[in-house]
A protein has these predicted regions:
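C-terminal helix caps at helix-to-loop junctions of PAS-family sensory domains
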Residues: 21-24, 32, 139-140
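Sensory/regulatory domains in signal-transduction proteins
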Residues: 3-6, 29-129, 159-176
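Long, solvent-exposed non-transmembrane regions
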Residues: 2, 10-11
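Short loop/turn segments that connect beta-strands within the blades of beta-propeller domains
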Residues: 32, 149-150
Length: 176
């Protein structure tokens, strides 16, 4: 599956969509732990990425503790998406402590598998909803737009801008 497939899956698959704008970090990892296939905005920020698309380009090396923990989880978690609470190092925990995470091994229609890891506690500054929505569409290669609960236009991916009738976000003021 391509990165754009996972961007769409992040908002279209109910198992991931529930986490898309959450203030808690969430990551969908490859089975071997080498890549984050999808992340919400808070999860991308945790790894220093501007958005999920940027994080999807990163490869985690063999010495990375996140990679090793995810690979171990993939072997231990039951197939079928049953959620299990795990205490993991990193994943938002303070240095030297463990974070309680909801973990599940997900299966997709194409036969692929991935590990969903969601931190159960927020650490540090809570990212405002408007910023989470903006980062959700930022960097997406597929047409996506984000709106606040009150209908306010927040942002759109580059691919969506021609469909919305403006060339850059400066033009959006006439739409709002």
């Amino acid at each position: 599956m391509t990165s754009s497939d996972f961007q769409l899956r992040g908002v279209g698959d109910p198992r991931l969509a529930v986490h898309a704008t959450s203030p808690l970090p969430a990551w969908l990892w490859s089975i071997d732990g080498t890549r984050v296939l999808w992340a919400n905005a808070v999860g991308a920020r945790f790894f220093g990425a501007a958005n999920a698309a940027a994080l999807a380009q990163k490869t985690f090396g063999p010495a990375d503790s996140h990679r090793r923990q995810v690979a171990q989880l993939a072997r231990r978690l039951p197939a079928g998406g049953a959620i299990r609470l795990e205490r993991l190092r990193g994943f938002g925990a303070a240095l030297g402590t463990l974070m309680t995470c909801a973990c599940a091994r997900l299966e997709f229609a194409d036969g692929g598998h991935a590990v969903l890891v969601t931190a159960m506690n927020a650490t540090g500054r809570i990212m405002p909803l408007v910023e989470r929505l903006h980062r959700l569409v930022e960097g997406a290669v597929v047409p996506m737009a984000a709106f606040a609960p009150d209908g306010l236009f927040i942002g759109a991916s580059e691919a969506a801008r021609p469909l919305l009738g403006f060339r850059d976000l400066g033009d959006r003021k006439s739409v709002v």
